[in-house]
């Protein structure tokens, strides 16, 4: 638990459809250890650690957060609840596609699978740019380098979060290219980060796509 954590929040949730928690993430930000998922998030710039695990019988999901205040922990829990798809009802999807000739076998074999999501909109944007038009394994390696070199940590934990938009906006293109990010992608990432960091684009707004 991070050194600045003075508050703890826990919640037990019943997914709307069968859910299998992922086994960590290739970018190294979400980690799995002994059946427990763990990652560092930043809420309003403050570090919060969130953990998730299956409850007894694997029907329920247990979420816990440790951070500077209950309010920040509550926000972090909500973000991970969204990212893990705990409230998604995929029963209609399974009913319609379990016998589909193309994807039916995959649907039947992994009923607890959820679409991959990110708990932070800028994280989703930054990684979408990194993952364009290249192999996913190569993109994940680039993301791990970005997190290792520019990401945020917190005292008391080895977990790391993505860098802020301001940090990426100020990163030299040559540095980003040294992570194996293509030149055009490096420029696009800096430009997108600059728009977010300056406030000209508010990803939390309902009309951010305009």
What residue ranges belong to the model's regions?
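HhH-family (HhH-GPD) DNA N-glycosylase catalytic core used in base-excision repair
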Residues: 1-210
């Amino acid at each position: 638990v991070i050194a600045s954590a003075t508050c703890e929040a826990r919640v037990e949730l019943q997914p709307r459809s069968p859910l299998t928690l992922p086994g960590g993430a290739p970018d190294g930000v979400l980690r799995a250890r002994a059946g427990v998922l763990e990652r560092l998030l930043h809420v309003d710039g403050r570090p919060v650690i969130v953990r998730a695990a299956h409850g007894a019988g694997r029907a329920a999901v247990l979420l816990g957060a440790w951070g500077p205040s209950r309010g920040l922990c509550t926000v972090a829990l909500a973000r991970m609840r969204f990212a893990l798809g705990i409230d998604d009802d995929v029963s209609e999807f399974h009913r319609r596609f379990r016998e589909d000739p193309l994807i039916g076998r995959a649907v039947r074999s992994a009923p607890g699978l959820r679409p991959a999501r990110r708990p932070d909109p800028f994280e989703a944007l930054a990684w979408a740019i990194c993952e364009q038009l290249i192999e996913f394994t190569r993109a994940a390696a680039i993301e791990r380098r970005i997190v290792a070199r520019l990401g945020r940590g917190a005292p008391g934990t080895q977990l790391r979060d993505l860098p802020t938009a301001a940090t990426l906006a100020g990163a030299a293109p040559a540095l980003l290219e040294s992570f194996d990010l293509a030149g055009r992608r490096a420029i696009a990432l800096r430009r997108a980060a600059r728009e977010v960091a300056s406030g000209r684009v508010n990803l939390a707004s309902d009309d951010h796509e305009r």
